[in-house]
Amino acid sequence: MKTQQVRNGRPRLSVAIIVRNEQEVIAETLESIRAIADEIIVWDSGSEDETMSLARKNGAKVFQGFWKNDFSAARNDCLSKISGDWVLWLDAGEKLADLSAKKIRDFIDSAADPQKTYLIMVEIPPADNRTAGEQIAQPRLLPAKAGLKFEGRLRETLYPSIQAAGLKVETAPGLISRHPRQHSQARKTRLANRDLGLVELELIDGNGSDPRLFLAQGEAYINLGSFDRAREAFIKAIELSEPGSSEMLEGYYGLLTGYNYDPDLRDAQMRVCLNALEVFPLDVQLLLAVGSYFQIHNRLDLATRAFETAVKFGQTNSSIWHLCELPELAASCLSIALQLQGKEDEACRVLEEALDRHPQSARLLRLAIDSYIKTGNAEQCIKVAQRGGMLSSREDPLVLAIRGACKAAKQEWTPALTDLQSAYLMGCRSKLCLRWLAVALLSNGQAEAAKPVLDQWQKLEPANPELLAYIAAVRETQNAFVIKAEQEAEEEVGKVKTAVRQYRIDPGSAISEIHPIRIPFVQHVTSSDMSITEET
């Protein structure tokens, strides 16, 4: 890698990618950066598929290297092929999201300082539409300076050489989005087995005092389902970490994750969480976790205090994997805790203030609409829908659906059905309309009429637990009519109404998204400081 040199007044950008057997995703990655890259370097460690051919077809210079069971060796060899002034690191399967390519190119051309390295946010999409994604800020944009190099067989890092070179670290614009395959269990298993082997090699080399090795080991055991071993590894990582360091916080996240899979260990999990809060008292994720624990145990006063602290003073360590939308999630948790205490007005005020800060948050918009429906406040609900761009005009059929939903929440079934069915006939197929129309029909004992509505709702949210409860209740009712007398079947109809009442307590089942709080961060902690690749 050469020293910084700008040609023709415009810095040259080299994009560097390490690959092995990535034919399914390499083209998409290269397509996302082709317009801004002056050079694309693909370093291949032994692909047996069409990866190299596809890379060349998409404009990359391809170099074949020998995999030495060492990520740093691979990355440093790749760096030696670079001829640009700046290096942007990507992995196969990653791409620059939305307008990020232009933002990064403009930043390099006008604002990037060769005496600095830059963090770029990397995001993993959510596994489904009911969970949050995860993100981390990683050093992905580097000046092409001699002396910058990676260290570590796995979880390789640039930070020692960045510090030695006297470079500052700041944040650049843009977002790198990872492929949904991050959620593939088969892939997690393959990478976990690889990483355990690399950890063992590092330990043989005498590097057993590095907490990052045990963080990687713990992550691997989590993905293999060996939770006892995972907890042991994370405890070791915590013991080896500097107090208050990112490694220690990540160790606590991992240890808490290791308790997620056994409900009998919930109390032990919370003891760990409280210990972690003594070191990291304002960490948002820890506050949400302990607040959820108190909420489960009906200590709503303590839950509210934890959530309120997260909203007002919460901090996020962006250098380790954390949930996306943490401020929005904290406000949602606080609002729900207040609702459970009957403090509806205060809960709505929390959501309104959060929407002022995050006006495009789908989570907050959904919860605010659910909250106003629950209180029967149709006009305020319509205002929130307008604010979120959900309504084309006041004549939008969704307005009728909202009015019907508010009436249904107050158990005014006949006028509710009139509005909801009118909205449906006018073509409204929003989840709000389908959900509340199904609720109204089921509450009136019209299970057969509710079936097509439930089917359409299921196409939008196939895993929604409220929906699945309704479908199961309808199916049970239909079976009852076949095998029982009419009088007995009436009792089964009551089960449908019971299911409706159960979910009507909390419209939208909003609590299910955060109650109990899961801490899945280590499931996506990478095999390296930079990325996951397919080296074996």
Spans of model-derived segments:
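Cell-envelope/extracellular polymer assembly enzymes that use nucleotide-activated donors
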Residues: 12-14
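Short, well-formed alpha-helical segments that are part of the catalytic scaffolds
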Residues: 17-36
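A conserved acidic beta->alpha catalytic loop
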Residues: 32, 44-56, 67, 91
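Conserved donor nucleotide-binding strand/loop of the catalytic core
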Residues: 52-77, 81
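Catalytic-site signature of metal-activated, phosphate-bearing donor transferases
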Residues: 72-79, 90, 96-232
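Short aromatic/hydrophobic "clamp" motif used to bind/position activated sugar donors
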Residues: 87
